[in-house]
Amino acid sequence: MLAVERQLQTKVSYQFIPLVNMKTIQHTLDLYHLSRCHLKQRQCVSCMLYQVALDIKAASFQGGQHGRQYLVNVQKIMSDRTVEYTDEIVKRIAQLANLDWATFTEDRHSQMVRKSLRKDQTIADDLGVIDTPTAIVLDTCDPDYSLLIHDFTYQKLIDCARHGQLHINQDHRLVHK
C-alpha cells in the first residue's frame, strides 16, 4: 500500500475483509482438488475458511498491521497445499505476526469477533462483493460514491486514478470525479 501512496502521492486508508461465501468455498475445493459434491469435505473447508476469517479478524483487534501481517502469513504458509490449518500452525502464524498469544486465543473464540466478522460479511454482500480479490474505494467526502474493482491489484487502483475514475483533491484524498 505504501507504493500506492507514493505513486498517487496521497494517503490511502484500507481495511482487509476476509470473504467467506459459496464462491470462496468452491474456489478452495478446486484449489485443493477436492470434490464439490462431497458434503463432508465441503463442510470441513467451510469451517476452516470461517476459522481463518475469524483469526484474521481477531488478529486485527491487536491493530490493523497485526491483522494484515496475520493475513500475509496465512497466505504464505497455506500456499503449501500439504499444510493443514491446525492449532500448531495458528500459533506459528500468530508468532510471525507478533501477536499477544493469550489475547489472540481469547479473541478468536469471542462473540465480539464473530459479530465483527458478520458485520464485515454483510458490508461485502451489500456492496456486491462475491469474489476475491475485490476492492471497494470509498469517497470520504461523498459516502454515496464507491468504486468496485474486481480482480484487484494495486496497479488497478493506480490506473483508476490515472484514468479519471478517481481524483486526488487538495487534501490529498481520493475522491470521485
Give the ranges of each region predicted by the language model.
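Structural alpha/beta surface segment adjacent to cysteine/selenocysteine redox centers
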Residues: 2-82
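C-terminal cap of thioredoxin/glutaredoxin-like
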Residues: 1-9, 85-177
